[in-house]
Amino acid sequence: MLPLFVAVSMKKEKDPFFERFLAKCSAIGYIKNQEEERTIALKKILLLATGGTIASTPGEEGLEPSLQSDGLAHMIGGITANYEVDFKDILNLDSSNIQPEEWQLIAGQIGQMHSGYDGIVVTHGTDTMAYTASILSFMLHNIPIPIVLTGSQLPILHPLTDGVENLRCAFAMAASGAPGVFVAFNRKVILGARAVKVRTTGFDAFESVNAPYAAIVDSTGLRLNKEVLPVLTGPFRPEQGLCSNVVLVKLTPGLNPEIFDMLLHMNYK
């Protein structure tokens, strides 16, 4: 957890009561001299924009992802002032159109650029965010920095958007040093392979399946659950090979078993 700093200009005329107050506050970490505060290095974060509701504006057929990363940067200046942030556009899609080719592109960009950053935030549409987070967890196994996906239920330009708070949480997680892939949403952080979207309109859109939250935001700040966080088990070697011939079949009473023969003839693995 990052300490709370209050910058104080030292008075030229010493007041004994004021001096005792400063000494006590310094002892518990609440006050830092302004010169000392300026020496604290900002975490370097990369934001990769892929589109989604968070980057959408009204169009002829409803919301359309059209806002570029520089537009996002303008809207969240109060957040990025606390970090050294670079922005890059790699996609501008409604996430319902995300395909395995896009997963390979996102993973490839992260694999190429991760060594220059303390963490990476990926803005993404909510419809398929859980799918992307899950596949990236395997494609980026043992990545040594936090990769945090986030988005919003309302566009960043909407006056009641949840996007700003979600990005605030995502940046905090990206700066935490915890390795792995995560989803940050509604002040909760979920392991990438455990996230599922359970609500289409509510801000509390994602839940964690069969695992506690990796972190939450409360009155103490970002609180990590160290028992849940991934542990590096070897060197990072990004995986680019994907098999798209995969289908999910939900078994129900009366299901015709010949469907499996049909799938085999269609080259599903």
Question: Which residue ranges define each predicted feature?
Answer:
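Short, positively charged and aromatic/hydrophobic N-terminal segments
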Residues: 17, 23-32, 36-38
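ATP/NTP phosphate-donor binding region
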Residues: 40-112
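Accessory alpha-helical/coil subdomains and C-terminal extensions
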Residues: 43, 48-49, 75-79, 191-269
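Buried hydrophobic positions in well-ordered alpha/beta secondary-structure cores of metabolic enzymes
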Residues: 51-52, 121, 170, 187
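Short acidic, glycine-rich surface-loop motifs adjacent to enzyme active sites
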Residues: 117-129, 266-269
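Short Gly/Thr/Asp-enriched flexible loops that form oxyanion-binding sites at enzyme active sites
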Residues: 125-145
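Internal gly/pro-rich beta-alpha loop/helix module
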Residues: 149-219
